[in-house]
């Protein structure tokens, strides 16, 4: 009988903001880390939660997302002061993060600012992007944290603003539901049912082929576009370019 221990850390961060052009983390700082420990698919209560002083002002847009004020952070520790404790907490675990590129980008940037030759996070942790997992399970569907909560009937009523620990706790519940083998057949058949209903009421019209030349984006261009929209939606809560 296997006695292997699987340790996962479900993690989320809040930041001073993000860049729309270039590296999304450059010049910005992490102001909150929330992490929830899951061992063998059980929440242990051994969580990591800290607010951080960024030594810079927050962007107004970021404040609108998480509601954390500059004044509140003045007496909080800096990332440098908690870095060792944080690394000890996550080292060797599988990190589960929704749109992992956002948070890992910030974490690696913060580590690099310490000038201690700390390696990339993915060298001492396995990183799993729960957004990528959700997209494979539900292609073409909305897979934001709120959408997944609705799909799995998980209570997120307290999520009026983004908060790292609350979001990590909610994501832990969502991820356990996603990977627990209890997905309702209704999820898989949702699109098929809608299509069948639509075909009963829609009259198909054959149009003449257009002579206009249509230029399609390449796979790389589409991937880059989706990655940027992910970052916008991650910390904005919504994205104008997505339904």
Identify the role of each PLM range.
Residues 102-105, 109-130, 219-243:
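Long, acidic, intrinsically disordered low-complexity segments
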Residues 12, 94-100, 106, 144-203, ...:
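Acidic, Mg2+-coordinating catalytic module of metal-dependent nucleases/exonucleases
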Residues 83, 142-145, 222-225:
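Alpha-helix initiation and N-capping motif
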Residues 80-83, 127, 142, 165-168:
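Amphipathic alpha-helical transducer elements in NTP-driven molecular machines
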Residues 2-3, 177-243:
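Acidic two-metal-ion nuclease catalytic site recognized across multiple nuclease folds
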Residues 124-142:
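Catalytic subdomain that performs nucleotidyl-dependent activation
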Residues 1-124, 135, 147-161:
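Conserved non-catalytic scaffold segment of RNase H-like nuclease domains
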């Amino acid at each position: 009988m296997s006695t292997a221990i699987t340790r996962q850390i479900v993690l989320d961060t809040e930041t001073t903001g993000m860049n729309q052009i270039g590296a999304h983390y450059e010049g910005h700082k992490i102001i909150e880390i929330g992490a929830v420990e899951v061992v063998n698919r059980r929440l242990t209560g051994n969580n990591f939660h800290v607010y951080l002083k960024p030594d810079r002002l927050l962007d107004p847009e970021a404040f609108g997302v998480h509601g954390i004020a500059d004044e509140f952070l003045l007496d909080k520790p800096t990332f440098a002061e908690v870095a060792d404790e944080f690394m000890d907490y996550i080292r060797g675990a599988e990190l589960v993060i929704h749109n992992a590129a956002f948070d890992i980008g910030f974490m690696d940037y913060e580590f690099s600012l310490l000038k201690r030759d700390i390696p990339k996070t993915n060298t001492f942790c396995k990183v799993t992007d729960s957004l990528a997992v959700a997209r494979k399970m539900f292609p073409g569907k909305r897979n934001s944290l709120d959408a997944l909560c609705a799909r799995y009937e998980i209570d997120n009523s307290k999520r009026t603003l983004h908060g790292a620990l609350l979001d990590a706790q909610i994501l832990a519940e969502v991820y356990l539901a996603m990977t627990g083998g209890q997905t309702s057949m209704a999820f898989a058949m949702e699109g098929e049912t809608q299509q069948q209903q639509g075909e009963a009421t829609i009259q198909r019209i054959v149009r003449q082929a257009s002579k206009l030349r249509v230029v399609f984006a390449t796979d790389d261009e589409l991937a880059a576009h989706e990655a940027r929209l992910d970052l916008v939606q991650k910390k904005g809560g919504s994205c104008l370019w997505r339904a």
